[in-house]
Amino acid sequence: YFQQLRNKVRIPITTGNAFTVAMVLAGVRKACDLMGKNLKKSKVVIIGGTGDIGSACARSLAFEAKDIVLTGRTRTTLEMAQGLLASLKGAKIHITTENNDAVREADIIVAAASAAQPVVDTNMIKPGTIVCDVGYPKNISHTSKHRSDIFVFSGGLSTVPTPFDMGFDLGLPNPNIIYGCFAESIILCMEERYENFSEGKGKLTPEKVEWIAQAGKKHGFELAPFYWGNELIDEERISTLLSKAVVY
């Protein structure tokens, strides 16, 4: 769709996924710090691991995690992604088409699938797991709130340097937060980079993600506080998580 749209308009366009990925990675790293997890010793499961956001997260985390498990609908596509990631000589790369089997032993889950309904049974997730759900609609059911022993948060959200009002409800918890994809367009304009920056699956390199993260920080766009739905995950909630979770 990106290529079709680009051919129909005379202005640069971007999916916004590079900055979304940057905020996902920042969220995972911060959650690891809060939960006392060592990312270098962790198994990371990426639901929707062959998609644009999922594959970009995998490329960056391949240099930070111990094991990465990619899930997807098509085994052939998964095998291609596995081969590309394995060539980076980083984390061990595994693949599966079964989401619930994959999450059983996960230390960290990045849920980035395109799905109309939740794709993971939260009862399969072990205590102490960090879950970053960047899917819209959400990959993880909001009924997961009954699991006070797992750290589930909405991924890909950014702060804004000034309250953001589009005149209608964006479904965000407060006006000081914006979707990462929206933020990317604003950041690129502020940097005067009028180009097709994020342009489709497989083209989001770790270098591009890092550049937009630093440009965003320069202009006041950084990782948003942790939320799940409209509920802020505050220090008290994190203390409860730590008391109930098995931390590795």
Which ranges hold each PLM region?
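Conserved active-site and cofactor/substrate-binding residues in soluble primary-metabolism enzymes
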Residues: 19, 23, 56, 73-76, ...
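N-terminal Rossmann-like NAD(P) cofactor-binding subdomain of oxidoreductases
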Residues: 7, 11, 17-29, 42-43, ...
